[in-house]
């Protein structure tokens, strides 16, 4: 009798474990295919590194801290994922505190297409494109001052240039990026104007 009860509990235990595993698998699968950014993260951007053939800097910010913030990346078509931790620091912008995260990917293969995503708070974000330089000729987008009244002109200029030059490897923004560097709304307008660009190719800002 005791043996039967033991076997029954064993079967029930295995059943529960299998159900939990299946549930976790569904969650991970849903996260893997998400088309949304990591909750709380905004203004994801690539920054030029010392050597763009083998390294890249990824930055983003959030209004609240993100636990265990990191960047996962992989070569396109390869399921092997690497991870690098992100350093978070408090940054005060126009009297408002926010969290600024920085992750540096190194020892990347040259001349390849990769993709990266943000992780944190037990969640993952969507994949973003990233390509490393091959050391040869390249195309870059070079913009003058982007400061303006409402940044609609800057948005039109940047987006049209990116569409006409999809092969561009990075972009340079010379001079004054915003009219008032102490006005956080202007920085948000500057970043919003670069949606779909700055997360895909790195920026080389010149203040």
Regions found by a protein language model. Give the residues of each.
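Short, low-complexity intrinsically disordered segments
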Residues: 7, 58, 125, 152, ...
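Acidic, histidine-bearing metal-coordination/catalytic regions of metal-dependent phosphoesterases
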Residues: 9, 13, 20-142, 163-164
């Amino acid at each position: 009798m005791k043996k039967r009860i033991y076997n029954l509990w064993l079967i029930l235990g295995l059943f529960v474990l299998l159900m939990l595993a299946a549930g976790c698998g569904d969650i991970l699968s849903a996260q893997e295919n998400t088309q949304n950014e990591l909750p709380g993260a905004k203004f994801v951007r690539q920054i030029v590194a010392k050597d763009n053939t083998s390294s890249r800097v990824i930055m983003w910010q959030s209004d609240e801290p993100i636990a265990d913030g990191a960047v996962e990346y992989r070569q396109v078509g390869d399921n092997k994922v690497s991870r690098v931790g992100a350093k978070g620091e408090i940054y005060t912008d126009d009297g408002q505190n926010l969290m600024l995260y920085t992750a540096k990917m190194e020892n990347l293969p040259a001349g390849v297409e990769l993709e990266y995503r943000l992780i944190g708070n037990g969640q993952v974000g969507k994949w973003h494109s990233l390509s490393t330089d091959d050391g040869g000729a390249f195309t870059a987008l070079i913009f003058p001052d982007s400061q303006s009244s409402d940044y609609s002109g800057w948005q039109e200029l940047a987006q049209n240039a990116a569409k006409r030059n999809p092969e561009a490897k990075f972009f340079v923004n010379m001079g004054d990026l915003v009219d008032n560097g102490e006005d956080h709304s202007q920085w948000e307008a500057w970043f919003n104007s670069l949606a779909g660009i700055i997360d895909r190719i790195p920026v080389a800002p010149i203040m």
